[in-house]
A protein has these predicted regions:
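Flexible, glycine-rich phosphate/dinucleotide-binding loops
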Residues: 12, 108, 131, 155
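Structural recognition of alpha->loop->beta junctions
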Residues: 53-56, 60, 111-131
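P-loop/Walker A phosphate-binding loop and immediately adjacent motor/lid segment at beta-alpha junctions
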Residues: 77-83, 87-91, 132-193
């Protein structure tokens, strides 16, 4: 598995304050994605022990709510094994931290993946430029869904996802300031080199 960046103290890619791992490799190549440098599975850096420890150091902090896997696509064939192994270690070491994952795949196609048992919230679906809406919470286009994975898996019919939250009016008052702010523009990835790059909802 390779990655492009580890973002710390992130408030845009999931509930609460989070650490975000941006992996390399994506086959969706969504039109309008402003993060195409993550599409190449051979790009970025090798995810090694030092990178893992960097994440663990963040998760050690009591104010960090959890980790978000984004990219790129964490479910790209080059990433699945590495992501699953890291998720397993995180759940064992930090059982109270939440795991979010962004993917361009649809829930219906991935719901039986064994790694789903480790994921708390999944944002699914390709970014659709025609459906782009910067007022949406935690996603870039209206076709995408923010899914409560464990609640969905506990149902008899797992093909109907339980949504983690609504998009606009049904978001509880105060949520924007107490947890994660509602998006007013594309998410920002701050690479170690100091260059800011906007990331649309593709972020799978």
């Amino acid at each position: 598995m390779r990655y492009h960046n580890i973002t710390k103290d992130d408030m845009l890619n999931g509930d609460g304050l989070r650490v975000v791992l941006w992996v390399a490799g994506c086959e969706h190549c969504c039109k309008g994605c402003q993060n195409p440098m993550t599409w190449d599975q051979n790009g970025g850096l090798l995810f090694d022990e030092s990178a893992k420890q960097e994440i663990f150091e963040q998760l050690d902090q009591p104010y960090i709510n959890g980790i978000t896997f984004s990219g790129g696509d964490p479910l790209h064939c080059a990433n699945r094994d590495g992501v699953k192994q890291l998720m397993r270690e995180i759940k064992e070491k930090y059982p109270d931290k939440t795991i979010w994952l962004y993917t361009g795949d649809s829930w219906e196609n991935i719901k039986n993946y064994s790694m789903m048992k480790y994921i708390d919230v999944l944002v699914d679906g390709e970014f659709k430029l025609a459906l782009r809406d910067v007022t949406l919470l935690w996603k870039g286009s209206s076709n995408q869904r923010v899914i409560n994975v464990q609640a969905t898996l506990s149902q008899e019919d797992t093909t109907v996802p339980v949504l983690y939250c609504g998009d606009h009016d049904d978001i509880p008052m105060g949520r924007e300031t107490s947890h994660a702010p509602k998006l007013t523009d594309e998410n920002i990835i701050q690479f170690n080199g100091g260059m800011d790059i906007t990331c649309c909802g593709c972020q799978a």
